[in-house]
Amino acid sequence: MLNIFSLICICLNSALYSSSLFFAKLPEAYAFLNPIVDLMPVIPLFFFLLAFVWQAAVSFR
């Protein structure tokens, strides 16, 4: 039971730490990549939605 609690605490701490990294600024040398970097977290959602569209297209044949 203690191990599960420890694992939950570790996961929460890493989630909080990673969310602070999410709002970090790029160095000035890479400032021109800001629009691409802002779009990058959304890209996996496009593949997720594409899977549903593909399944719908296949089932209607």
Curated annotation (Swiss-Prot):
Residues 1-24 form a propeptide. InterPro entries: PSII_PsbK, PSII_PsbK_sf. PSII is composed of 1 copy each of membrane proteins PsbA, PsbB, PsbC, PsbD, PsbE, PsbF, PsbH, PsbI, PsbJ, PsbK, PsbL, PsbM, PsbT, PsbX, PsbY, PsbZ, Psb30/Ycf12, at least 3 peripheral proteins of the oxygen-evolving complex and a large number of cofactors. It forms dimeric complexes. The keyword rRNA-binding does not apply. GO terms for biological process: photosynthesis. It is found in: Plastid, Chloroplast thylakoid membrane. One of the components of the core complex of photosystem II (PSII). PSII is a light-driven water:plastoquinone oxidoreductase that uses light energy to abstract electrons from H(2)O, generating O(2) and a proton gradient subsequently used for ATP formation. It consists of a core antenna complex that captures photons, and an electron transfer chain that converts photonic excitation into a charge separation. Belongs to the PsbK family. Pfam families: PsbK (PF02533). It comes from the Eukaryota. It comes from Panax ginseng (Korean ginseng). One of its GO terms (cellular component) is photosystem II reaction center. Disulfide bonds: none annotated. The keyword Chloroplast applies. Keywords: Chloroplast, Membrane, Photosynthesis, Photosystem II, Plastid, Reaction center, Thylakoid, Transmembrane, Transmembrane helix. This is Photosystem II reaction center protein K. It is a single-pass membrane protein. The chain crosses the membrane at residues 40-60.
